[in-house]
Amino acid sequence: MARKPGRMYKKFSGPAYTRREYMGGVPGVKVAQFDMGNLTEELPIAVTLVVNETCQIRHDALEAARISANRYLLNDVGKTNYRFKVRVYPHQVLRENKQATGAGADRVSDGMRRAFGKAVGTAARVYEGQGVFTIWVNRANFEKAKEAMRRAGHKLPTPYRVVVEKGAELVK
């Protein structure tokens, strides 16, 4: 069965659904790494992707954005000239009430009876003004870091802005 579109899980209300010890069959988190690049060197400029709306970001979207930005930085800047961090973790478990389709589905399906749903993935709850990714670079690679953030932002289900958190005086 096909995955449901991300817009179905974008908005949230009610308490978080995160207690995996009470659930069975929760899929693993797709985000492979949360820290990339040169983790030891102190770099002077920090560029952060900040969301403009409160929403949920599925782990698929986080991983797609992470891969996009990291690959761009790795190819254009080099592994030793940046540090990239994913600042949110997809704790929220997403559920789906699977519906049978096709011939005879009405005999097999329960419809909306017992419609709690099964775990199909995870998402990170982010709030307006929260940072999702941060890249630390030197002055020479500042524009490339901004471009990497732009590429990552296109993979997210919410409007975003790129903010210089540290070293703003170096890039003026």
Curated annotation (Swiss-Prot):
Query: Could you give one GO CC term from the UniProt record?
Result: ribosome
Q: Which InterPro entries match?
A: Ribosomal_uL16, Ribosomal_uL16_arc, Ribosomal_uL16_CS_euk_arc, Ribosomal_uL16_dom, Ribosomal_uL16_euk_arch, Ribosomal_uL16_sf
CDD domains (alphabetical): Ribosomal_L16_L10e (cd01433)
Q: Does the keyword Ribonucleoprotein belong to this entry? A: yes
Q: Which PROSITE patterns match?
A: RIBOSOMAL_L10E (PS01257)
Q: List UniProt keywords, sorted A-Z.
A: Ribonucleoprotein, Ribosomal protein
Output the GO biological process annotations, alphabetical, semicolon-separated: translation
Q: Where is the signal peptide?
A: none
State the Pfam families in the record: Ribosomal_L16
Q: Which GO terms fall under molecular function for this chain's record?
A: structural constituent of ribosome
Q: Which family does it belong to?
A: Belongs to the universal ribosomal protein uL16 family.
What is this protein's record name?
Answer: Large ribosomal subunit protein uL16
Q: Which organism is it from?
A: Methanocella arvoryzae (strain DSM 22066 / NBRC 105507 / MRE50)
Q: Supply the source organism's classification.
A: Archaea, Methanobacteriati, Methanobacteriota, Stenosarchaea group, Methanomicrobia
State which gene encodes it.
rpl10e
